[in-house]
């Protein structure tokens, strides 16, 4: 894991600690107990998320996509489900979490990222394109520093710039 303070130095959770220490030599690096994280993750998925739906795609110890379309009659709305998840995770485990709600995985992931460190953001279908286009390039999952630099060299500084480009450009 990388704290929000560490992320300001370009450190991310997938980065090797040796590289992170070069980027932030005065940082405090704590040992990671992955077995504990996996156990907590398993409990949260079993005790909280599975109570909503069985349609869960877990992508890491702390991230998943849920298709809640079959749960709406019982729960009322996606935002009610998201609020309940955040409440239960906080009450049961004293852990904060962010929830992104959208009609597809890409926009849901971007909404969750924008809701960090402890919020919820719902993007209605009619606003998907507008939301994505207002994002900086790095706001798109998969665009890291090197791809961003290449796009910048081509005059692309935002998702809106990217959307305006033709295939011939």
Please tell me what each predicted stretch does.
Residues 62, 72, 96:
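Active-site pocket-lining segments that scaffold enzyme catalytic pockets across diverse folds
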